[in-house]
Amino acid sequence: MDPLKICENYLTFRAIIRGSTLSPGFFRRWCFPALADVVGNIVEQEEGRFWQILPENHAFWGLLRRGFTVASFTEIITAAQLENRGRQLAFLAFISFLLRNWPSDSVVPEADRLDLVCAPAWSRMQIWSQTARLINDLQDSVLEEQGSAEEEECEEALLAGDSDDPLFG
């Protein structure tokens, strides 16, 4: 299961996050993507760690209460490192944790909260995915160029008779 691949579509990503905020049971398991149940279970198991990262008295919760979401989420989301599946799942779980614990007295309507969190988080995942793909493509092309350069050198040496190999000297 590759979370980056599964979350390529925004609507699928949104459904995963929405499903992961629900309590465990039949509805979450059968009405949402399978990854929603996995992420929801991670949130429930690691909630204590998430509270250590972002305690209840942290200024972040006050900003959410007052509706200042852009700067808050930008700072948290851009710091995410998504280089392996474990970190990707932890990122999804943390996003779900934020939604689950959004202050109930916030000026942000409940209907808008999901998209306020999902849009920047999904963008971050897409940027990470594209960057990883570009790096892999670049590494592959460098390896191919090195291989073809070595082959050309060998061919030139053979044609010129300058080879160190006693069979071709």
Curated annotation (Swiss-Prot):
PROSITE patterns: BCL2_FAMILY (PS50062). The keyword Hydrolase does not apply. Keywords: Early protein, Host-virus interaction, Inhibition of host apoptosis by viral BCL2-like protein, Modulation of host cell apoptosis by virus. The keyword Ribonucleoprotein does not apply. GO terms for biological process: symbiont-mediated suppression of host apoptosis. InterPro entries: Adenovir_t-Ag_E1B_19kDa, Bcl2-like. Belongs to the adenoviridae E1B 19 kDa protein family. This is E1B protein, small T-antigen. It comes from Canine adenovirus serotype 2 (strain Toronto A 26-61) (CAdV-2).
